């Protein structure tokens, strides 16, 4: 189930899943709390600023509580994509300081471009460095190329929650 809260890159997510899992999964896009609760897996996309995505989540009455119950209380798999993942943090500093979902202790901050060493926004294909076994990377080889479009990064307090990095 893909959560539709009017701030996600939903068409890109649907196209990606259709490309890699066509006929293997049933994709449903919804903001219906009952459908989200009854799902076995949920995807939380996100596009735009941290603040706008958090505000959009909060604008749907009961959605944050439903996602908390789903992921934290019931420990069901929830995949955050882009800002969807960043919102798992305690806090984000894009635009203004904004409280996140608080599922993973840490903060979302602007990427340190190390005095121009890295161009921002970070756009393009980069290799990922898998540093920890994770279900999300089960069938993905280390140094695989992934596509990135972002200027902010999630810095968790506990580095043991990091599964992969990129330069």
Task: Give, region by region, the residue ranges found by the protein language model.
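N-terminal beta1-alpha1 cap of cysteine-dependent amidohydrolase-like domains
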Residues: 1-78, 83, 96, 107-112, ...
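Active-site catalytic microenvironments for nucleophilic, acid-base chemistry
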Residues: 19, 90-91
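Conserved catalytic-site region of short-chain dehydrogenase/reductase
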Residues: 86-88
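Pocket-forming structural segment of enzyme catalytic cores
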Residues: 91-166
């Amino acid at each position: 189930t893909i959560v539709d809260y009017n701030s996600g890159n939903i068409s890109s997510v649907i196209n990606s899943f259709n490309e890699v899992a066509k006929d293997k999964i049933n994709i449903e896009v919804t903001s219906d709390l009952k459908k989200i609760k009854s799902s076995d897996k949920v995807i939380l996309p996100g596009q735009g600023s941290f603040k706008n995505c958090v505000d959009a989540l909060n604008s749907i009455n009961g959605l944050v509580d439903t996602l908390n119950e789903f992921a934290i209380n019931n420990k069901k798999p929830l995949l955050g994509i882009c800002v969807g993942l960043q919102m798992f943090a305690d806090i984000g500093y894009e635009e203004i300081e904004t409280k996140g979902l608080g599922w993973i202790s840490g903060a979302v901050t602007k990427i340190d471009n190390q005095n121009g060493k890295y161009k921002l926004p970070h756009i393009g294909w980069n290799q990922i460095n898998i540093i920890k076994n994770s279900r999300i990377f089960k069938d993905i080889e280390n140094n695989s190329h992934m596509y990135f479009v972002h200027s902010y990064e999630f810095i968790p307090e506990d580095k043991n929650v990091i599964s992969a990095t990129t330069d």
